[in-house]
Design a protein with these regions (language model features):
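Conserved nucleotide-sensing/catalytic segment adjacent to the nucleotide-binding pocket
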Residues: 204-250
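Phosphate-handling catalytic cores of nucleic-acid transaction enzymes
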Residues: 303-345
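Alpha-helical scaffold elements adjacent to nucleotide-binding pockets in ATP/GTP-utilizing enzyme cores
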Residues: 52, 56, 178-181, 211, ...
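Conserved two-lobed SF2 helicase motor
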Residues: 212-215, 258, 262
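N-terminal nucleic-acid engagement/recognition segments and initiation subdomains in replication
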Residues: 1-129, 137, 240, 266-267, ...
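Short, polar/flexible loop-turn hinges at active-site or ligand-entry regions and domain interfaces
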Residues: 7-9, 59-63, 138-143, 266-270, ...
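Positively charged interface segments
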Residues: 66, 70, 88, 186-188, ...
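P-loop NTPase catalytic core of nucleic-acid-dependent motor ATPases
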Residues: 24-42, 47-49, 92-212, 281-284, ...
Length: 439
């Protein structure tokens, strides 16, 4: 043992508080929202911290050393605690410095940050030819700028774009290779996850805290029973209520973006609101040529270009910011979203059908009669009818689109005033007699 005795160990007594003061005087460290943060970003694994504390203590503290290390870490959480540590959205912390949105770069790691990417900034990095060729083979040219902007969007802790992305194909195109490359770009700031799990598990959101990107590389085909958890992540702009199993809920920063690869659409079982679909950027892949021979090393080749991919993504981020966080969206992508929306809500096709109803400014029809006509249309077209309440809600939500007006002043066949719609006429007369009354 050396002759020097630290202030936190005097007369055989170990002072945890003084140890933490000494430790923080030589280490940039803070604790917020249940995690330690350093100039390298969030501390994902606390073991290196515990090992360093152990090495500092082992010469002076003998018995119960492991337990005392745990106690020190707990005291350190209190000593390094800050009330709030909000995300900073005008810069990207990288392996060799900080890149600001205006293009300026500052070398070094002078400050504690929430997220730091494991990629160096090199303004002279070569163009990522394998990456660009891969995207050209996978996607239609007009959709590549959307991917560029979305990946760039994920570089900063912001949800201003309020969009998630779904890349859809038939299988075998290689779209999930994008996730492999993004894992190299984002490192521990990206997580593999499941959109389905997020939608049904109230604890899943907390697992995405401090994360820039969540990738679902094989999205489940089942329609989501509830969409509020997914929508809250996509649109979060500030702190939200998070909950971990067995613990009290708390307010935490949420800025994880969602990216899914799938062979089908992201559908909702009950949510037919425009908002659920409006939040999706839906891109479709090209058909895989029968003569194409896949390169088994393509993921590694693209990952080796990560510094060039960073510059490419940063260009997309700058364009997105310049456009007020409005994504470039091709007519194909817009049509994809409309088709998905229609596929989940056949009320649109019913309203545009012939022989069942007619849009007519001076006509009016009760909600009940319209719903019976709609059920007839569904039965004759081998489609499943949604519930009456959902049908009326869909009409109300789209009444401006079809020049309808919801009212409670429609006179039905019995002479009673009931709810209905002005601007639509039923061309068929379904039997409104309750089935229990029929002979």
């Amino acid at each position: 043992m050396s002759n020097f005795t630290p202030a936190w160990f005097k007369k055989g007594f170990f002072n945890e508080s003084l140890f933490c003061d000494d430790f923080l005087s030589t280490h940039q460290l803070l604790y917020s929202n249940g995690a330690f943060f350093t100039p390298d970003g969030r501390m994902v694994d606390p073991m290196p911290l515990r090992c360093e504390i152990f090495e500092m203590m082992r010469e002076y503290v003998g018995a119960n050393l492991a337990k005392k290390v745990t106690n020190v870490v707990d005291v350190l959480k209190l000593a390094a605690q800050v009330e709030d540590f909000p995300p900073v959205t005008d810069r990207i912390a990288l392996a060799n410095g900080t890149l600001y949105l205006d293009g300026t770069f500052q070398e070094g790691k002078p400050e504690i940050v929430r997220n730091r990417l494991p990629v160096k900034y090199d303004p002279k990095a070569v163009q990522p030819v394998h990456w660009l060729q891969f995207l050209s083979d996978l996607l239609y040219p007009e959709d590549i700028p959307t991917v560029q902007e979305f990946i760039g969007y994920c570089l900063i802790p912001s949800n201003k774009g309020q969009r998630m992305m779904v890349i859809k194909g038939s299988g075998g195109e290689g779209k999930s290779q994008i996730g492999v490359v993004l894992s190299r770009l984002f490192g521990c700031n990206m997580k593999d996850g499941s959109i389905g799990k997020i939608s049904e598990n109230r604890f899943a959101r907390a697992d995405l805290e401090h994360t820039l990107l969540c990738v679902d590389d094989d999205m489940r085909m089942e329609a989501l029973r509830q969409t509020n958890y997914v929508k809250s992540i996509v649109t979060a702009q500030g702190q939200m209520d998070l909950e971990r199993k067995g613990k009290q809920s708390y307010q935490g920063w949420m800025y994880a973006r969602l990216l899914a690869f799938s062979n089908g659409d992201l559908q909702a079982l009950y949510d037919r609101s425009d908002g659920f679909y409006r939040r999706q950027l839906i891109l479709t892949t090209k058909d895989k040529p029968l003569s194409r021979v896949d390169d088994p090393d393509i993921a590694e080749k693209m990952a080796a270009e990560v510094e060039g991919i960073l510059l490419w993504a940063f260009e997309g981020l700058q364009r997105l910011v310049e456009n007020g966080f409005q994504f470039t969206e091709s007519e194909r992508a817009k049509r994809n979203r409309e088709l998905v929306k229609r596929d989940n809500n056949n009320v649109f096709d019913f309203l545009e059908s012939e022989g069942y109803i007619r849009l007519k400014a001076d006509a009016c029809t009760s909600s009940k009669e319209l719903y019976e006509v709609y059920k007839m249309w569904c039965e004759e077209n081998s489609l499943n009818a949604i519930k009456a309440r959902g049908f009326s809600d869909a009409l109300i939500a789209n009444q401006r689109r079809y020049n309808l007006e919801s009212t409670n002043n429609v006179v039905n066949s019995s002479g009673r005033r009931v709810r209905g719609f002005v601007g639509i006429e039923a061309l068929v007369q379904p039997d409104l007699t309750p089935s229990s009354w029929r002979v």
